[in-house]
Amino acid sequence: LTATISFLDKIRASSEKAILFAERKETQKMLQRVVKNRYGYTPKIINGDTPTSSDPNAGKQSRQSAIDDFQNRHGFGVIIMSPVAAGMGLNVTAANHVIHYSRHWNPAKENQATDRAYRIGQDKDVYVYYPMAVSPDFKSFDVTLDELLSRKINLASSTIFPTERIEVKPEDFEQIFNI
């Protein structure tokens, strides 16, 4: 939490905006209280409880209205999101800082969440932060999870490659199918 507050202090000093990703609703509420107490305003939270824009009962509480409020806010701002609920279909280009307060076990979901800031209309460099608890005496859970996610990413990138790079020749078919 100390590192996250330090990041937010620097972001505030630059009058920029941040997306703060956290998995658990309790953690999201705690982060909301921290931002309110430290910076004097209550950031919106987007998670599975936040109605989508297509929900006729959503009104001013929809995900898109929360993002619109955040996008239109002048100066420093924070929006708190679940990486799963906000992972697809939302554009948050007013933010150029992304903080993954808690990590998702699936690096693809984490990348999709980060991509909320990397959209058409983003005109600033985007910075991504992964605050971790570290210790000189033992390997923390955060470090272990970061290593696991790195291995998953490396495995995926070494086994999956774009199909346009595949060149199949007729002799390959002959060899494979003994034709």
Predicted regions and their residues:
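Alpha-helical elements of the RecA-like P-loop NTPase motor core of helicases
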Residues: 2, 29, 33, 90, ...
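Hydrophobic, well-ordered secondary-structure elements that form the walls
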Residues: 4, 20, 80, 98, ...
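Conserved helicase ATPase core of P-loop NTP-dependent helicases/translocases
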Residues: 19-21, 29-32, 39-86
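A short beta-strand element within the Helicase C-terminal
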Residues: 90-103, 126-131
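Conserved catalytic network of the ASCE P-loop NTPase/AAA+ motor domain
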Residues: 10-13, 69-74, 90-92
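A conserved SF2-helicase RecA2
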Residues: 105-179
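Conserved helicase/translocase motor-coupling segment
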Residues: 1-34
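Short beta->alpha connector loops at strand-helix junctions that form conserved
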Residues: 47-49, 101-104
